[in-house]
Amino acid sequence: MTRDDALPDSHSAQTFYENYEPKEILGRGVSSVVRRCIHKPTCQEYAVKIIDITGGGSFSSEEVQELREATLKEVDILQKVSGHPNIIQLKDTYETNTFFFLVFDLMKRGELFDYLTEKVTLTEKETRKIMRALLEVICTLHKLNIVHRDLKPENILLDDNMNIKLTDFGFSCQLQPGEKLREVCGTPSYLAPEIIQCSMDDGHPGYGKEVDMWSTGVIMYTLLAGSPPFWHRKQMLMLRMIMDGKYQFGSPEWDDYSDTVKDLVSRFLVVQPQDRCSAEEALAHPFFQEYVVEEVRHFSPRGKFKVICLTVLASVKIYYQYRRVKPVTREIVIRDPYALRPLRRLIDAYAFRIYGHWVKKGQQQNRAALFENTPKAVLLSLAEEEDF
């Protein structure tokens, strides 16, 4: 067992060990490890986040105190939002001089990131379910003036029924009325333009809850396209793309999606925060609207006849389009296999199956490194403007 795998000694964490039996590691953070654990009285499975506030002994006393206060703030926010069906539930907490133990529900399906790596891209139907639940969570947070600041697929967990649970509130903050934030935190490819601007301009007024909506747009784009809208191997170029709001619904990956879903994504990815779509506004967008059951079932004779006529016309049109479809020849497949949707999905799926394991959590790693759909024209124009 390496030092990173070692557990806190039983003497300092006696109360925790009396109630829980820690098992294998599920994930790691900068100063924390997440393990599966068993609640001894009930044999129920949970996940415990073990936070070393000393950084393995490398932190100064000021850094230890800062991390301790940040952890207590995370616990406080989790308790304030307790009970929401799409937020991870904090079941128990333990504290020693050097460690925190935060016990959560165990989400066996893992992260949305891993599910996306397996599926490559999601359909509009799957995306609608996930994004509606995420936006409802954000509505709840923002009504309490809580900004998450680290929304990304790695921090969205899935239960056995594919329902989401938002987790990792380590960067979260509850704002006072009129308060603005200035500190730079989060994951680079999900940062809102105003966060980056704060790091470059001492006179910047700061940012607020709108940063979560930008990250939501990046998540939604990523679910549909398979890679984020802003990415470059040179991080400075990527940050420049974010600040300029330069992204595209490129072909062929966006050819099969509706204009409605593209419109919603574009309402999130607006550089000016005051013009960005809020969570409540997004939930009212046509992408999330459903037919009212009573209205659907109410047919008039005239309406029935109209539906029959339209169905016949559509069937005839589909039939003739099918008859006119050119056969896929060997030459077409050799020349541009990626232009054919079935082959495109097959190629992407096998690429992720072979290489997806190394595209994971590090800030220098990104899905786009493996599944690069970013239009080259955008990158070239940026490179010409400024040499990094």
From Swiss-Prot:
Residues 343-367 are annotated as: Calmodulin-binding (domain-C). Residues 303-327 are annotated as: Calmodulin-binding (domain-N). The keyword Cytoplasm does not apply. GO terms for molecular function: ATP binding; calmodulin binding; enzyme binding; phosphorylase kinase activity; protein serine kinase activity. Belongs to the protein kinase superfamily. CAMK Ser/Thr protein kinase family. The two calmodulin-binding domains appear to act in concert to bind a single molecule of calmodulin and are pseudosubstrate/autoinhibitory domains. This is Phosphorylase b kinase gamma catalytic chain, skeletal muscle/heart isoform. It comes from Mus musculus (Mouse).
